[in-house]
Amino acid sequence: MIKSEFVYLVLKDVFSIKGRTYNNRKHIQSSVGWLSKAQDEGVDGGVSAWYGIFSGWSEPYIETTGYIISTFLETYHLLKDKIYLDRAIKMADFLVSVQLEIGGYKTYLNSNNKKDLPTIFNTGQDLIGMVDIYNETGNIKYLQSLTKAADFLCMNINKDGAWKKYSYDGKSHSYDSRVSYALIKAYKATKNKKYKQVALLGLNWAMRQQQLNGWFKNAQLPPPNPIVPYTHTISYTIEGILCSGILLNDSKLINSSKKAADAILDYYSEKGFIPGTFDSKWSSDDKYTCVTGDAQISVVWSILYLLTGQSKYLSASEKVNEYLKSLNSVDSKNNNIRGSMPGSYPIYGDLIRGQGYCRLSLINWAVKFFTDAILLNELIKTNSSIKYIGK
């Protein structure tokens, strides 16, 4: 049965009615409020993956629960409210409870046999949050968990830097650069040089997928997704390389990520719109946006602003964020909707072509990256220190 609240969301997009926007802090509070609701709808501290038009609240998504930890820790330091730290700790404890003996975290919560296997990419995203919660609390159980996860990732990389075993489809992907980024964070936390060595192996593989124009091969999700990558996975790739480059002070990595980020900025500057996917020529005829990807590229541009001081990056980030704020349903009276973000805009994607990303769903990773984007803008605006996002 269709959830009645989606009728409003669909009609709003049909008639291009945008929501009212507010200051950054109001949107941050609204978004982490929705993520808190998603956590309460989950199990044992895990964050529900989505609120769907037919299904309502889903079971917790182990992968995204991991990197939502970092968002809550950053929010805790900005808003000075311990509830966000407490919730981050509950997420971390949930991850510890679903970690397998071989070191990776479960891919699915309610899994059996084959589905009990971990996934390289998902474990990497959980490792990001586990490093951050360890750095925040100093709790030895988180150190033990992150060490097991990092060791698992190191044991399963190929000599050429590709991660194929325990991948979604037996193939390595450019966006595994965010797995390398997680290992760099683990290296910084533990001083285990093996983590850095393996991370660089993976990063070099990812950079070998880059074309001269900055586009990355092998950045698409497995079928039945499009044969060209969503901005979501393109941004994962850029983020992983950029943040690793910053942590290692490696100009080669930074320049690689910057080339791709600049290509998207050029497109956005000309079109005023970021399409859901890009082909190898940085072109697209998509009629929808991938909201998660929009938020992620905003994060990338803010980080590049902090790195270079070039105002074009901050200006583009702020402009994208203003559009994203209008999708945030801050004024909704329904607490399943208020503070959420859709998978696509319009929420139904491209109905004629049957295209879109997570259509007719409100997804926790879109909210996570939107919150990160707004947090960065607010921290830059107030000249405050950034503790976790991109660190």
Task: Give the positions of each predicted feature.
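Glycan-recognition and catalytic cores of secretory/periplasmic carbohydrate-active enzymes
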Residues: 1-391
